[in-house]
Amino acid sequence: MKNYQMIVDAQKCVGCHACEVACKQEFKAPLGYFRTMTMYLDSGTFPKVKRDFLPLMCRQCDDALCLKACTKGAISKENGIVKIDESKCTGCKDCIKACSIGAIYVNPFTNIAEKCNLCEHRLEEGLQTACEATCVANAITIVTDKKDIPKEAKPFKNHKDDKPGTLHIGANEKMKNKLTFGRSFSPLNYEIENWAVDHE
């Protein structure tokens, strides 16, 4: 049985948002809702300024907080993928409150929780995930063999109890200050002029 794991190289990401668009198109996510979001952080002062990017999606956590929070038994993990059973989900939003990076939303039309599932339907057909296939910078990779994990890849933890399956390379740790429990990926939830800038 394959165990899928995503590697995100933030050092390669150019912030083009192609992964977000590909994901929305693949899953027909409602307007204003995202399974994937590329965050960015500006730092420095003119003329020495820098912008870091960080593609974020469900990190397919081990012992996932959302799984433990779901009282309906709608969330499970198999093959390295944290899955939501649509037939059991009631849209109660307990999983949203539990996720430390806001990777889950409830579809307003179906009242069912949705998030990244590593494009499981594509992987089963031997295809790349929509985001990996679309990334122009080759910043996203899915591996099934531990030997293929770069030594510099590590979990991007936003909470002490997080156990991300997805690993990041070169992620700016200050971006953790921009993430909040229970706030789903959406431009409606983030004021760009505030969360994009490092005020420290």
Question: Where are these predicted regions, by residue range?
Answer:
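Non-ligating segments of multi-cofactor redox enzymes
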Residues: 1-200
